[in-house]
Design a protein with these regions (language model features):
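Conserved C-terminal portion of the radical SAM core fold
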Residues: 226
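Nucleotide-activated sugar donor-binding and catalytic core shared by glycosyltransferases
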Residues: 1-221, 229-353
Length: 353
């Protein structure tokens, strides 16, 4: 939020993905003095065991230790009644909510209300969502389905629909950015595969490999590597060789700014990520979603095709990806402006705005 909102903010970083976090922070030219890492980590987590060890170290951090770190970084410490903003459904979302409760904070959850039908799928995201909804008292669902999920759960506090994801505002900020090495003029495809349920399933992994190889028959496919995917291909050298032989080019994980440039210039996107689904929906970019189900409604049956790993659907998309192209989304009132308004109202009710 900018200075015109009259809300003072600080960013507490959990340490889950330090490399990627600071890259994104720099993408938006944010002041490093406004962020502090509460867990000393130097690399993005790759394995479930690493994530588990990090989470339990972080969750037992004493409030007094956290307050001391904040005073050293910002000159102030968390106060009872402060609003703590958490976003999404990661372990960091849950961790931030726990920290907020321990410090007497009010939890505002952005991207609230997303639900699957299964508590362990996706794991641990679905569990994180449900727990955070019980802890939060300000809920910002991005669509009507998410809002109704919160209503049916009888969550406490205010439910404030944003009618879209705040990711839209991030895309708008970077819309005209021109940064980095020039991109190819010839057609190419961007792929982004990283979900645990896909990397750990033999059948799904084979379907993903086959899909990427089929796409590469017509144009180069740039597979952007997440830490879990990189580890998977190191362990499965035959798959790595198969992709390389087919014309799939692996790229080191790039910054958010660069990734959006790649999406914008690409012919289409292949992904198993919910955020990528939203990005493509807002940009009007064709996207083949390699998942069984998606909790998000953005772009479905429009620019985004949910494959459910059905070969006929995958072939249908690959045969005519341009038929899924749509116009870019335009909001009259952006999701982030709605969130900021909700925060201002919450502070006003508290008597401190």
């Amino acid at each position: 939020m900018d200075q015109s909102t009259h809300l003072t903010w600080r960013f507490l970083f959990t340490g889950q993905s330090p490399v990627n976090f600071w890259r994104q922070w720099q993408d938006f030219d944010l002041d490093n003095n406004l962020a502090v890492s509460l867990q000393a980590t130097t690399r993005d987590l790759q394995t479930a065991s690493q994530a588990l060890a990090w989470f339990f170290r972080a969750v037992v951090t004493a409030p007094s230790t956290m307050r001391k770190q904040c005073i050293n970084a910002f000159g102030v410490s968390p106060q009872a009644g402060d609003i703590w903003i958490v976003h999404g459904d990661t372990l960091s979302t849950l961790l931030g909510s726990i920290w907020a409760k321990r410090n007497g904070g009010i939890i505002a959850h952005i991207e609230a209300g997303l639900r699957s039908k299964y508590i362990f799928r996706p794991f641990p995201e679905e569990i994180n969502r449900r727990l955070v909804s019980r802890l939060a008292s300000l809920h910002f669902p991005q669509d009507e389905v998410a809002r109704l999920n919160l209503v049916s759960q009888s969550v406490k506090g205010d439910v404030i629909p944003t009618h879209g994801n705040t990711l839209y505002d991030a895309l708008e900020v970077l819309r005209d950015s021109n940064w980095g090495e020039p991109l190819p003029d010839s057609p190419f495809v961007v792929a982004n595969i990283h979900r645990n349920e896909n990397l750990s399933s033999t059948d799904r992994w084979e379907c993903i490999l086959e899909t990427l190889c089929l796409a590469a028959q017509e144009q180069p496919v740039y597979l952007v590597m997440h830490p879990p995917t990189e580890l998977k291909l190191k362990m499965d050298s035959a798959a790595h060789q198969r992709l390389a032989k087919a014309g799939v080019i692996t790229l080191p994980r790039v910054t958010f700014r660069r990734f959006i440039q790649l999406i914008n210039k690409s012919r289409y996107v292949i992904s198993d990520g919910g955020s990528n689904q939203e990005e493509c929906a807002y940009l009007g970019k064709p996207c083949l979603i390699l998942r069984e189900e998606s909790e998000r409604v953005e772009g479905l049956n429009e620019s985004c095709l949910l494959s459910k790993f059905i070969p006929e659907k995958i072939h249908q998309f690959l045969a005519s990806p341009e038929s899924y192209a749509r116009s870019k989304t335009i909001f009259s009132k952006t999701p982030s402006s709605i969130v900021v308004g909700g925060l201002q109202d919450a502070y006003a009710k508290r008597g401190t705005a």
